[in-house]
């Protein structure tokens, strides 16, 4: 039997023998593609190549791509564990041609691999083609020799693929495997096609057309090929099993899941869910995603919690999910070294998330069970689903999963409506960013010269106004200018774009920002003088002070990153950065606040490298060579085949396309200004360098001097004086609280008490006390009386604060919250609470006596009823 590991290697080796360049799997997080939540196909990393935006030094490629379908349009989560072939995470085998070979070669490669390399019986294979694709039919029939009756024409979208509403598209041919007559199902194109007998194993897409906005198509100048074959699916065929969960890789994970959950039935769908989900979770965490309440982090949290719930369902009594990581590393670590490198981070993240969820899951299940007991039909309300999500952390699909097991469904539309209301409440206005890649479709190439110079003579290639290509632009008009060469750095890798001017005979253009579109560098700004025309000669001049300050901050981020790893540990992975002339901001993975001692160690390490004045060296080399040198690849950056490696002595070595100082000493000084959390498991450090670091130090010193002057202290006794002052304040606060209590006790003689039978009613205003004192007095009344209703207020200027208490024995007659609403209506206020205790405040103290009189009447009326 061929193992999944062997099959993966065999596929790569075969296509390498056919002159395909083996490219590593890209991240599950698509770089620079906001249309996708996760990488869900092998072609995603080559999208810009197919579109002609990016060029590679190879025209044939082979990959084994990590894919995830668990959110957005492509979401298989609900079916995972209950069908033979649905997964959240899967591996896609693929070979690609970028204007090289086409239908004949692509079909021949696939057929040879299937029938010769892995020796599938020819009589077991069927193919489909797009109905009008006679060229593909001829290749299959005349070149391959496949019988006509085994070539099925499909006249539907199933056999025509497109990248989107516009862009590259074309027909495809699919290869199917026949599992035999004893399995239910019919041929593709028949009413019984959804059965399990005929299973699609390979899809070969021929991108030969370009679809336009009006729906018409034209031939692409260089047709390309994109293929995909699910590794798990073809493994099942070769291992002679009908379910992907029966292949060697999954069986190892399922057995481990049974062991750590103590499940009795190894065939339980829950174990399949756990085995599937550990792959998705581990690879997401390894690719930089951490559990959160939105975006990709929320999808990860959903998957983790679904796995935990299924573990509890089959018998897990303690945290278990992280225990599968070791087996996963054993099965897939050889192919994906990131699992080995990030194992500790993966395990820690899963432990923390499981501990967090277990605190709430029991209460959530009780709410769920109580709801279904009172159901009048078979639908759980969206409001209940939202409560489970909002209060107990139950993702919607987890609630839906539990409902399905009970033969119930959940009102998803009502749930989504509740989610929308919550989003509107918490929505914050975000900064508007122009997407220049979609606004401007430049086909020209700008040469960047800014590593070695800040001034460059250049020629105007393109001018854009409002996204439209124009021949010239006039004074005081905002525009985008593309040059043949430029010293201006375009925003990338967290570093902002340069500022400066473009000047020529009779004109001056102020550059406010610089971005990229394809290979064009866009100078964004305003013409402040004269007229600018296509083909004008000019001098491009970068403002040197902002550039140098930005370079110092960028170099400091490299030193900071290495210092974080040394002080906090290797798990500290970059999650994002921002570098401009004023500061640097660095986001990284870490699960707790950084202590003052750790910040001092980090600052000390960075400043030691600055004082060492190491040369900052740059080399350009292959990705493979850079990796062998130990270079760190930065988060969110896309690298070409030749990469730029920045080294700072022996301390730091990173791949980076940004601008840097010549020597670490040019950074001057490094000072952390803030540290905090921005998401679950993600911290942010902000820092300054050079003059701004010195000024930051001066500011802090001046504050300390001002404090010393105020306290008449010196360096020796400052801390002791502050401690002494705080102790005095604490003692005075205790004395004030005591006096307030005595004041309230003294006022008790003036507080009017009314009795209705055995019920005592207290309604009074007491000035000069705070809410805490009122609350203590209410508790005192309730402890001394089994039946009491007490309403106490205090005023300060026009403000009113109140506390209301109702004995538990009386809450069936009247509730504290209802009294709070009545009082609030008379004092322009608001308040609320439980049946036995409520509090609130208002902005109208002028008529407090009248308000209390109305409240007393309200209480008496309710008691009498």
Curated annotation (Swiss-Prot):
GO BP term, pick one: negative regulation of DNA-templated transcription
InterPro entries reported for this sequence: aa-tRNA-synth_II/BPL/LPL, Ala-tRNA-lgiase_IIc, Ala-tRNA-ligase_IIc_anticod-bd, Ala-tRNA-synth_IIc_core, Ala-tRNA-synth_IIc_N, Ala-tRNA_ligase, Ala_tRNA_ligase_euk/bac, DHHA1_dom
Coiled coil stretches, renumbered: none
Binding note for cofactor: Binds 1 zinc ion per subunit.
Catalysed reactions, semicolon-separated: tRNA(Ala) + L-alanine + ATP = L-alanyl-tRNA(Ala) + AMP + diphosphate
Location of the protein in the cell: Cytoplasm
Annotated Gene Ontology cellular component terms: cytosol
Binding site for Zn(2+): 554, 558, 656, 660
Domain of life: Bacteria
EC top class, as a word: ligase
The entry's keywords: Aminoacyl-tRNA synthetase, ATP-binding, Cytoplasm, Ligase, Metal-binding, Nucleotide-binding, Protein biosynthesis, RNA-binding, tRNA-binding, Zinc
EC number: 6.1.1.7
Cofactor dependence: Zn(2+)
Major localization listed first in the record, in broad terms: cytoplasm
UniProt GO molecular function: alanine-tRNA ligase activity; aminoacyl-tRNA deacylase activity; ATP binding; tRNA binding; zinc ion binding
Record function comment: Catalyzes the attachment of alanine to tRNA(Ala) in a two-step reaction: alanine is first activated by ATP to form Ala-AMP and then transferred to the acceptor end of tRNA(Ala). Also edits incorrectly charged Ser-tRNA(Ala) and Gly-tRNA(Ala) via its editing domain.
Domain comment as written in the entry: Consists of three domains; the N-terminal catalytic domain, the editing domain and the C-terminal C-Ala domain. The editing domain removes incorrectly charged amino acids, while the C-Ala domain, along with tRNA(Ala), serves as a bridge to cooperatively bring together the editing and aminoacylation centers thus stimulating deacylation of misacylated tRNAs.
Family named by the database record: Belongs to the class-II aminoacyl-tRNA synthetase family.
Protein name listed in UniProt: Alanine--tRNA ligase
Organism: Francisella tularensis subsp. holarctica (strain LVS)
